[in-house]
Design a protein with these regions (language model features):
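Glycosyltransferase donor-sugar binding loop
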Residues: 39-45, 230, 255-260
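A conserved mid-protein helix/loop that constitutes part of the nucleotide-sugar donor-binding site
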Residues: 19-24, 225, 229-248
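A short, active-site helix/loop in glycosyltransferases that binds the activated sugar's phosphate group
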Residues: 134-136, 172-197, 203-205
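Short N-terminal targeting/anchoring amphipathic segment
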Residues: 96-104, 113-130, 147
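Acidic anion/phosphate-binding donor-loop and adjacent secondary structure
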Residues: 155-162, 186, 202-224
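Nucleotide-sugar donor phosphate/pyrophosphate-binding loop at the beta->alpha transition
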Residues: 105-112, 134, 151-170
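Active-site proximal beta-strand in glycosyltransferases
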Residues: 6, 124-129, 135-154
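N-terminal strand-loop element at the rim of the active site
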Residues: 8-15, 32-99, 196
Length: 260
């Protein structure tokens, strides 16, 4: 059987739910069936070491790396690109009223013009994060099928809808992580509602069990229930529900420790 060529495009592999989900997906793929390339806008992150060895991490996109990397040494190597990054970022923020919109503007008016296309052609190409990864997928990748991913409730992202609609129309499917997120996308883009599909963030039980055996943190209490909540401290993550649950446990006289 001829192996299919697949590309994943991602911002980085720093700590985050989308990053963890991507690594889990890569660990579940059958590499006897797929040749997999991974393109990172920033070739870094705590999950890099967990990427399967069968995955080819593309490492020759110097223009892309310089535009998205804050490394001063890299900036000195490529002063022209560094200048575009600084000027483009400054003008984009002046032209818009949010970080999200400024990054959309920066891609459309600055980065899109100088980031080169990938030369390799793919059977399937996947932008595993919304915004610039999706724009790169549409503008710079040749693939028979293109899939975009939205890992948040779209209405909370603060994007220019008109720009995203233009790009969503050019992909085959837009995957999101919950029925609520899909409903929100369909309400924002009713003309392409059939493109939105749901695939919850993937977890690997094998990886979780392996990591659990590595060590016990000093905060771990063997004689009580340990509850760990991980995430950004903002309204979207809903940490107030964890506090409500902790109160109920206390009322029920359950011995526990809560860690945030």
């Amino acid at each position: 059987m001829e192996k299919r060529n697949v590309l994943f495009v991602m911002s980085s592999l720093r700590n985050g739910g989308a990053e963890r989900s991507l690594v889990n997906l890569l660990q579940l793929l059958d590499y006897d069936r797929y040749n997999v390339d991974l393109l990172l806008f920033q070739n870094e992150g705590m999950f890099l070491k967990q990427v399967p060895k069968a995955v080819n991490i593309i490492s020759n996109c110097n223009k892309l790396y310089t535009l998205y990397d804050n490394n001063k040494a890299e900036a000195l190597k490529h002063p022209y690109l560094s200048a575009i990054h600084m000027i483009g970022t400054f003008i984009s923020r002046k032209k818009t009223n949010s970080v999200a919109k400024s990054r959309q503007y920066r891609w459309e008016h600055f980065y899109k013009k100088i980031v080169p296309e990938l030369t390799k052609e793919y059977d399937v190409a996947i932008a595993y994060m919304q915004r610039e990864q999706t724009y790169f997928l549409v503008d710079k990748v040749k693939a028979a099928k293109k899939i975009a991913w939205v890992h948040n409730e779209y209405s909370q992202l603060g994007h220019f809808k008109e720009m995203d609609l233009e790009y969503f129309e050019k992909v085959d499917k837009v995957v999101t992580i919950s029925d609520l997120c899909a409903k929100d996308l369909k309400e924002n883009f009713p003309s392409i509602a059939e493109k939105f599909v749901v695939l919850p963030n993937l977890t690997s039980s094998q990886v979780i069990r392996s990591l659990a055996k590595e060590f016990y943190p000093p905060e771990f209490k063997r004689d009580m229930l340990n509850i760990v909540s991980i995430g950004r401290l903002n309204a979207q993550k809903g940490f107030e529900f964890a506090l409500d649950a902790a109160l109920e446990l206390k009322k029920s006289k359950v011995s526990f420790i809560g860690l945030f």
